[in-house]
Structure formats: structure tokens, C-alpha cells
Amino acid sequence: MTVSFPLTAAALREHASDFRAYEQQLALELGGLSGLQINELTFARLTKPDPLRLFGLDGDGEGVLMLGTDQRDMLVPKLSETLLVLPPEGYVLDIGSGDGQTTSYALEGRSEPLSIIPLDPMEDSLRQYQDLFRTRHPEISVPRVITSGIDELIEAQIAGSDTLPEYFHAVISAHSIYFSSSAPGFLSFALDRLHPGGKLLLVFAEGLGRFTGGMTLGYLEKYGLDPEGKERSSQTVLDQMIGLANGTTSRSDCHASLLKALARNDFRVAEVVTQPTRIYGHDLGDMIAFAFINKLPIIDQNLTRQIAYVSQRLQESPDTFDLRVHVSGPRARMFSLAQPQLFLAVEKL
């Protein structure tokens, strides 16, 4: 059983000096890096393995896939429902693949051959992806990797590039759609590449409830960096596209909203699930750093100002982000913030 307690602004005021120290540490750690490098380095805090599970010592069954978030714990079973029953010799496109850990966990237990093409802008992550599948899934082929962002991939396909196979049996996009300049364009692209009966497995943190999105929007608005509100629109466009209202949606609402947004009817919404996921850190410095796992370090380069802003927001409004400290469970003695995610399975007809 997990027990946690919310932290108040009054309690955090007594630790103002700790926040200043963490701000200085982060400035030293992240200074001089590109936006993508900052994104990758801070994201690594999420993917720290559970040492008990890593060494097979979680005999009580409380081991977790990542210490930094329960998103993978909740997502992997949903991905497995589709990936484990794909036809032999099927093809999968893994967009924003990272190092492949999530997809690898979802494929545990599959013995039939499968081909996966991962796409990610970070070359190191793609090399790790290939090494991981070569070691853990020898029956699954990674015939090639694509070092690219989403927009670049779509532009290449429009230009007539033969970068991709003719079709895929599944397209995975786990927390990568934020980096597309057009959510409707991305979804249409994914549906175009699917074989009839294939599924788009889309995962994203709700624009209306996520810590990272809230921090990015607040920062841009405070310093007047998005006068036309383009970022706010992009942060909420996915919520609007799937019919998310007041934090909930249904398959029928989602389907109706997607029909309108995409102006096509060759799909059906197979499943839509909101998962009450969280992100976890060992100290308050981790919690500040988590604001950089999204677009914040890419859309503005003033790192010192960004760090100070995030730190101040956390201290003044911890209840807005449901900042907590855990006293029991697999992540005891860790801090956490609310970062709900939504899983959407769309089948091509």
C-alpha cells in the first residue's frame, strides 16, 4: 500500500535555501547544453531503474519498471495487448522511441518474428535501442533506425522519400506527439501508414492537467514569449481533438471529435483510457528538473531564468501540481507530482 502526504507552501517556505541550492546545481549541470540535450538529460531522471527489480530482489511483487514515473507501469500492459498479437513478420513504427525500454517490456513473451523501425532525433538512443533488442529480443528485427523528428519524417514522405515500408501493423507514439507542429497532421500521417486492422497506439499527458505543460505555458505567459498564444493552443489541441472535457472523455465522444478534426472516417476508436500517473524524484532538484522533459528548454534558451521560474512556482503553488512526499510503497521517501496520461488506441478500417 502506498501512503503519501501533500506538501504545502508553508512547509516549503522553510526550505527556501534548499531550493536555491538545487537551482545552482541544475544551472551547473545543464548550462551550455542544447535544448535537446537538456531534454534528454532531465528525462534520464525518470528512467532510473528500480534496484530491487534490477537485481531480482523484489520478492514482494512491489518492483516497478522505472523509479521516476509510474507511466510505464500503466502503459506497458496496454501496449502488450496489441503488440503480442500482431501477425508474424508484422511491422511496427515506434515514433519517439527513445532507447526502446518501454517497447521492449511490452514485447516480453512474444516469440513470433516482428520488425520494428524506431524513430528518434537522438542517435545515442537509437543505438541503445538496437543493442537492447539484439540482446533481449533476438527474434525481433530492427532492420533500420531513423534519426529524425516527426515533422522531418512527414516532410520526407510528402517529398516522395522511400524512408518507410508501405504499411505498418502498429504505430506507437508514446509521449512524442508534443514535438509535432500539427497534431491533426501527425495523426493523419500515422493512419495513412497503417494496414487495415492495424492500430495507432497514442499516449500523451493531458494538456489540461500535466505539470510540464503548465510550467511551459506559465513561463511563456509571464515573460511575454508567446503573444499570439500558439503554445497554449498546441498544448490543448489534443484534448480538444479527442473530446476531452472536464478531465474525462468516452469512446463515442472521442470518435466524434476525431472525425471532425481529421475529416476522414476510415478509423474507429478502439479504446480511450485516462491513467492517473505521476512523476517521482529523489529530491526537490529532481522536481524542478522535470519541467524540462517537455518543450521548455527547446522554445527558450534562458536556462537560469527558466530554473528560477519553475522553482518559484513549485514553492508558491505546490497544490496546483499535487506535490507530495511518499512514506510507503515502492517509491517511499520520494517526491511526486501529478502528470496524468491518456492512452488512445485507434484502429484503421
How should each PLM-predicted stretch be described?
Residues 184-199:
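A short glycine-rich, Lys/Arg-flanked "PGG" loop and its adjoining helix->strand segment in the class I
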Residues 156-171:
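A short acidic, Gly/Pro-enriched loop at the edge of an enzyme's catalytic core
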Residues 93-94, 99-154:
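Class I SAM-dependent methyltransferase SAM/SAH-binding core
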Residues 168-184:
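A short SAM/SAH-binding and catalytic strip from SAM-dependent methyltransferases
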Residues 199-236:
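Conserved class I S-adenosyl-L-methionine
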